[in-house]
């Protein structure tokens, strides 16, 4: 089968607003205007989402910073105290990081979206107001054409009726019928002119509407493409910002883990014994003294058993658990 010449192929129609929103009774207007309205709803919802997400970060950062100021291991010592100090310090860093994220979400997401949406809204209103005004005029003129056509059609039907009746009446009735015919013919001339003029006016308005609606479709598509690109980029930035704080939190947690690797249980026990130990001497219990027998000098002011003690040399008993 021979190939079909390119010149004989049906022209391709681009998938655009301007080629797909027409139809009887301007059927394409409502879906397209609804799309533009829904686009505004999406932008408003996204702005609210960013606002609330930033507020969550602010609240979380505030709670982290408050927690970081509270004592942690204030009575502790040694390497565990050092690790706890790192925990508090990194908690403060995490709080500041989340605080910065909240500011980023406001400055890099919420505010640019608000500015962009405001600009889109103004441009859409200008296009939509012009279209709605022209569509109202076109609708009114269509109504005028329909009414003029109905009047003209009724006059034509009356004339046909009078002409048909003229062959069936005579005398006085014939004269009356002729008078009505002449009157209706004069009236028909006027209604015909009105109808013709209304059609001409509507034809001009329709041509103008077709031009302006096509231009509006192109502009609406421009707005939609800009909005979709902007929203995609904005959400991409949101994901990047959100992942940044995850990386920051993980870095702080890694510092905590590293400090815990330096936490030495035996070293802390030895340090506590060295700093606070009270000695190995276990005093013997006091012995009975017979004062009547004179086991002690009567002039002694007290009784001392300092020299009587044993040295602690116990074996450590481990917890079986």
Regions found by a protein language model. Name each.
Residues 1, 9, 36, 82-84, ...:
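Detector for methionine-enriched segments
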Residues 2-31, 35-42, 49-52, 56-67, ...:
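Membrane-associated scaffolding surfaces of BAR-superfamily helical dimers
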Residues 42-46, 90-91:
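Glycine-/proline-rich flexible loop or hinge segments
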Residues 63-168, 172:
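Long, charged all-alpha helical bundle/coiled-coil segments in cytosolic proteins
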Residues 165-167, 173-184:
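Long, amphipathic, heptad-repeat alpha-helical coiled-coil stalk/linker regions
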């Amino acid at each position: 089968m021979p190939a079909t010449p390119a010149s004989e192929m049906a022209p391709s129609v681009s998938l655009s607003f301007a080629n797909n929103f027409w139809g009887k009774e301007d059927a394409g207007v409502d879906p397209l205007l609804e799309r533009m309205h829904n686009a505004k709803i999406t932008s408003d919802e996204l702005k609210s989402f960013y606002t609330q997400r930033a507020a969550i970060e602010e609240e979380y950062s505030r709670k982290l910073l408050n927690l970081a100021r509270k004592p942690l291991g204030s009575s502790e010592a040694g390497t565990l105290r050092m690790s706890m100090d790192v925990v508090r310090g990194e908690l403060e860093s995490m709080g500041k990081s989340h605080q910065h994220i909240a500011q980023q979400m406001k400055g890099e997401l919420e505010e640019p979206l608000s500015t962009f949406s405001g600009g889109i809204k103004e441009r859409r209103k200008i296009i939509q107001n012009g279209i709605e005004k022209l569509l109202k005029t076109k609708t009114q003129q269509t109504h005028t054409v329909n009414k003029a056509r109905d009047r003209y059609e009724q006059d034509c039907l009356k004339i046909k009726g009078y002409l048909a009746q003229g062959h069936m009446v005579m005398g006085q009735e014939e004269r009356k019928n002729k008078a009505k015919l002449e009157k209706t013919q004069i009236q028909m001339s006027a209604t015909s002119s009105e109808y013709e003029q209304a059609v001409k006016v509507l034809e001009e308005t329709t041509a103008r509407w077709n031009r302006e609606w096509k231009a509006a479709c192109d502009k609406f598509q421009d707005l939609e493409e800009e909005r979709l690109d902007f929203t995609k980029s904005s959400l991409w930035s949101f994901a990047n910002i959100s992942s940044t704080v995850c990386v920051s939190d993980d870095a702080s947690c890694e510092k905590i883990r590293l400090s815990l690797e330096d936490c030495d249980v035996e070293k802390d026990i030895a340090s506590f014994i060295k700093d606070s130990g009270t000695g190995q001497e276990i005093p013997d219990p006091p012995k009975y003294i017979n004062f009547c027998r004179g086991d002690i000098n009567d002039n002694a002011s007290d009784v001392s058993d300092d020299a009587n003690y044993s040295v602690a040399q116990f074996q450590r008993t481990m917890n079986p658990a």
